[in-house]
Amino acid sequence: VGEGEYALVELCTKIEGKQDITSTQNMWIKQDGKIYKNGIRKPVDLDELPFQDWTIFEPRRFYKPMGGKISMTGTFEMNRGCPYSCRFCSDYGLNKLYANNGGYYREKSIKRLIDEMKEKKERYNLEFAYLVAESFLTTKRERIAEFIELYKEVDIPFWIEARPESINEENIKLLESSGCEGISLGIESGNMELRRNLLGRNMNDETILKAFSLLEKSSLRVSANNIIGFPTETRENIFETIEFNRKINVPGVMVSLYNPYKGTALREYCDEEGLMRKDAHAGDYRSETVLNMPQISREELLNLQKIFPLYVKFPKSEWPRIEKCEGDGQEAEALYEELSREYTEKYL
């Protein structure tokens, strides 16, 4: 329950010392048929955490497709949490959990971040960096300026994520001057009513369209994040999201499957509507959905996720061919492989 760094250390220390573990904070522990629901300790000071230990991973784990090629990539936490509380996101539950305990959102100092990035670059010959920040630009301007100045000591391309509301010409110029190579923006749904009322993302279509239009004129690589499979969402709604992506003409198209994280408002809705087992855990957003919805089947969702980028990028004259990929059998799979090769050659 909550953060695990100090909780795990405390648990292991108690087990090693053969001490009672039932009072370990940030954990609910079942022992002898009784459940001990312990409280939440104060949020971790990110600057106090040690540098990541990458020696436990095989080197091949760090080679990732970033910036249009496979690069030795390091992932670095810039802040933890999010000042927003979208109803489908795990940060919704974490913000609620820590509301009376200092709040969940916090930022790592820029100097601490840069020190770790420099150490990892020198030790592992990093070629690329991915910054973990729910929205890179949703912070004080002074903090961004400090990062840009100190990042000169790291000097490798990096990728960020941001919200459409934070994109303007001034921020784009800052990013271009900093060594930022790419940026991902969350669309999530192309249906504005669903986006606002169900997801809690209070932004209109014009805001999103303007953000992508400004980025299209920049030197930054751009991708759009989408999610399908929300409760109440229909096939028609999903195609609204496809059409919205076609309108912005973004180079990179990412699509995930909605999964109901515990503690979120949308999970509560799914439970109330009987869309899932009460004891079900959220699945892998890249390949699984745990919802059983009357308006669209699991199989249809999985197929639409697979061919979503094809619908976005190919001309509509190809849509009948793409739709055939939704079928079962070898013929549908062979056609999907053929179209995927064409997609790679034309659009990647």
Which residue stretches match the model-derived regions?
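Glycine-rich beta-alpha loop elements in corrinoid/cobalamin-binding modules
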Residues: 1-42, 257-259, 263
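Conserved strand-turn element in the central/C-terminal portion of the radical SAM core barrel
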Residues: 136, 190-195, 199-200, 212-237, ...
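Catalytic cores of alpha/beta
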Residues: 171, 231-246
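Histidine/acidic-residue-rich catalytic or RNA/ligand-binding cores of hydrolases
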Residues: 144, 238, 267-268
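Flexible glycine/proline-rich, aromatic-decorated loop/lid segments
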Residues: 183, 273-282
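Radical SAM [4Fe-4S] cluster-binding motif and immediate context
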Residues: 52-223, 243
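Radical SAM enzyme core and accessory elements
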Residues: 265, 278-279, 283-348
